[in-house]
């Protein structure tokens, strides 16, 4: 249904954002992320879904034009590849709107949420009904303390002018000290004073205008304490965002594509060609994340006996169907197996696996092996090593180099250090999940090597993202840039893969951006202890931190382009 402006949801339009040419878009229901952004514009605004970039933003109605009517005017307003992709998508939307429904999931969720104005009206009606019920039961006597009296006393306390110190007078409440207040109304008052700004301002206006009849100056709020007495308390300050215009002019983060479930029926050609002779030992695996799923699949397909555990138990079902056992806790995995692998998200979670409740240290570690595959710093690895050895166990750090695809194909690179005998016992597993495994000596060497390689990867990707952003702004075809790059000696599989993801504007997770930033942070920490300057790494780390703050932490690391582009 269209409103007074003539625009309705699903209308196709040209929307002009500050700093950009008119862009093909669609009038949309604002998703939850966009509703959180305060709109400080003089003119009415509409939520626009931008084709090509698949982003949302608030756009003033004065900057919106009907698509078909102004198509010829704006058709050549930009020469970028993303603009051409947007034109292609909007024409496809005109023919087959259902094809684009998966992109509008956030709108459907937002549509099911209660409207803030309706929620406010419900609260206001609750206050009004509470007033009537209280008045009917207790009458108008002040001694009986009706609900209107409570509201009047609160407003009186908040609207009384400030008394100068020289006057040496105190403002006292006119009501008796102990009050028997209707619980519903009391809760409503506190809710109004502590609610978010979008509702709180309306609530304050209602209390000021509807009860006292005049606006009150800014004062400390008078609230009722547990004993029913009026006390002066500082209400929690409402956070007021500064009017930062550039935040409104940046597209809202896109919904991260769901990671497809792993196909347990297939086996990669690389694994099949190796003729792996599986070890007779029993292996445990903690963590079935982006990398863990592919690793465990290849262990099972190569004939290894595996026991798995994951915080989200539903991820274990597919592996249980193909022969894996499922344990209830990390300590149970250790008890049931000879060697346990851990592959979780970060150093803190890795420590939780070992030292946490029902963790590895709760089990009998005598003669057992523990292999840490999580990307950690040398200090964390040494802490885990000392703990495992203190209980009679053996420790190996086996850092992995590669992405989700390489984990599923069994073509990772393993960097190991620690117990040499344990490294030899794990060779059949390493053969199933990697194309090469290296033993680097004492504990800590593998983690250092991994962080250095991640530095190279992170800095390179940040450079590719900035270069692609510049190419787009300069009017060059990003596809042409990649084609030329592929012919040079700078070309690499990673550059081309990430570059194609940037062109498509889709960032399915192969290596999460937050994990890349974590590795750069750990590398900087390592360098700080060695007093080694890393200015380029530090700058790259800030770029990833910014992209993560924009909401792209769970996207692929190539989403750092969004920060460079916008």
From Swiss-Prot:
Binding residues for NAD(+): 284-298, 518
Residue segments, region Disordered: 127-147, 206-234
GO BP annotation list: transcription elongation-coupled chromatin remodeling
InterPro entries: 6-PGluconate_DH-like_C_sf, 6PGD_dom2, 6PGDH_NADP-bd, GLYR1_PWWP, HIBADH-like_NADP-bd, HIBADH-related_NP60_sf, NAD(P)-bd_dom_sf, PWWP_dom
Keyword Aminoacyl-tRNA synthetase: no
Coiled-coil zones: none
Primary location class: nucleus
Gene Ontology CC annotations of this record: chromatin
GO molecular function ontology, one term from the record: nucleosome binding
Family matches, as Pfam families: NAD_binding_11, NAD_binding_2, PWWP
Protein's cellular compartments: Chromosome
Domain PWWP span(s) in chain numbering: 9-70
UniProt entry tagged with the keyword Ligase: no
Region: Dehydrogenase domain, residue numbers: 274-566
Domain of life: Eukaryota
Keyword terms of this UniProt record: Chromosome
Protein function: May have oxidoreductase activity.
Swiss-Prot/TrEMBL domain comment: The PWWP domain is a H3 reader and strongly binds DNA. In the dehydrogenase domain, the conserved NAD(P)H-binding sites and sequence similarity to plant dehydrogenases suggest that this protein may have oxidoreductase activity. However, since the active site is not conserved, the dehydrogenase domain seems to serve as a catalytically inert oligomerization module.
Description of how the protein assembles with itself and partners: Binds to mononucleosomes. Interacts with male-specific lethal (MSL) histone acetyltransferase complex at least composed of mof, msl-1, msl-2 and msl-3.
PANTHER family the record matches: CYTOKINE-LIKE NUCLEAR FACTOR N-PAC (PTHR43580:SF2), OXIDOREDUCTASE GLYR1-RELATED (PTHR43580)
Similarity section: Belongs to the HIBADH-related family. NP60 subfamily.
Protein name per UniProt: Cytokine-like nuclear factor N-PAC
Species of origin: Anopheles gambiae
């Amino acid at each position: 249904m269209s409103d007074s402006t003539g625009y309705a949801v699903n209308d196709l339009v040209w929307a002009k954002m500050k700093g950009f040419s008119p862009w093909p878009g669609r009038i949309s229901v604002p998703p939850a992320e966009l509703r959180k952004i305060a709109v400080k514009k003089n003119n009415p605004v509409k939520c626009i879904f931008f084709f090509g970039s698949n982003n949302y933003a608030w756009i003033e109605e004065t900057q919106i034009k009907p698509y078909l009517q102004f198509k010829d005017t704006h058709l050549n307003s930009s020469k970028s590849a993303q603009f051409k992709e947007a034109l292609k998508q909007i024409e496809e939307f005109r023919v087959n709107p259902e094809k684009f429904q998966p992109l509008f999931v956030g709108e459907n969720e937002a549509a099911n949420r209660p409207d803030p104005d309706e929620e406010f009206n419900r609260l206001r009606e609750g206050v009004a009904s509470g007033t009537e019920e209280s008045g009917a039961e207790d009458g108008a006597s002040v001694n009986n303390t009706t609900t209107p009296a409570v509201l009047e006393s609160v407003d009186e306390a908040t609207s009384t002018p400030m008394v100068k110190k020289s006057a040496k007078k105190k403002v006292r409440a006119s009501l008796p000290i102990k009050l028997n207040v209707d619980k519903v109304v009391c809760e409503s008052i506190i809710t109004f004073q502590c609610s978010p700004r979008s509702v709180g301002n309306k609530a304050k206006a209602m209390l000021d205008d509807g009860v006292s009849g005049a606006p009150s100056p800014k004062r400390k709020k008078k609230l009722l304490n547990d004993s029913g007495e009026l006390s002066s308390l500082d209400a929690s300050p409402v956070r007021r965002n500064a009017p930062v215009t550039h935040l409104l002019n940046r597209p809202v983060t896109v919904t991260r594509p769901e990671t497809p479930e792993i196909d347990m029926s297939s086996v990669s050609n690389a694994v099949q060609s190796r003729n792996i002779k599986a070890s007779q030992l029993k292996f445990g695996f903690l963590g079935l994340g982006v990398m863990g799923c592919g690793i465990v699949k290849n262990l099972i397909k190569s004939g290894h006996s595996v026991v798995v555990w994951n915080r989200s138990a539903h991820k274990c079902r597919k592996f249980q169907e193909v022969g894996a056992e499922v344990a209830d806790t990390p300590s149970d995995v250790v008890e049931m197996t000879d060697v346990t692998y851990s592959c979780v998200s970060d150093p803190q979670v890795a420590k939780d696996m070992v030292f946490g409740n029902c963790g590895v240290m709760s089990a009998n570690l005598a003669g057992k092996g523990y292999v840490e595959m999580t990307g950690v710093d040398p200090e964390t690895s040494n802490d885990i090593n000392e703990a495992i050895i203190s209980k009679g166990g053996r420790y190996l750090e086996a850092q992995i180099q590669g992405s989700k695809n390489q984990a599923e194909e069994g073509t990772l690179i393993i960097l190991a250090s620690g117990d040499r005998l344990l490294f030899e016992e794990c060779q059949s597993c390493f053969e199933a999940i990697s194309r090469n495994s290296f033993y680097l000596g004492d504990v800590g060497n593998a983690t250092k090597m991994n962080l250095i390689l991640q530095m190279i990867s992170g800095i390179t990707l940040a450079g590719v993202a900035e270069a692609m952003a510049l190419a787009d702004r300069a009017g060059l075809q990003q596809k042409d840039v990649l084609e030329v790059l592929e012919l040079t000696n700078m070309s690499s599989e990673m550059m081309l893969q990430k570059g194609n993801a940037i062109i498509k504007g889709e960032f399915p997770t192969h290596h999460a951006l937050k994990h890349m930033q974590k590795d750069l942070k750990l590398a900087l920490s390592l360098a700080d202890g060695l007093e080694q300057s890393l200015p380029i790494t530090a700058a790259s780390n800030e770029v990833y931190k910014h992209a993560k703050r924009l909401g792209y932490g769970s996207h692929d690391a190539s989403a750092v382009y969004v920060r460079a582009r916008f």
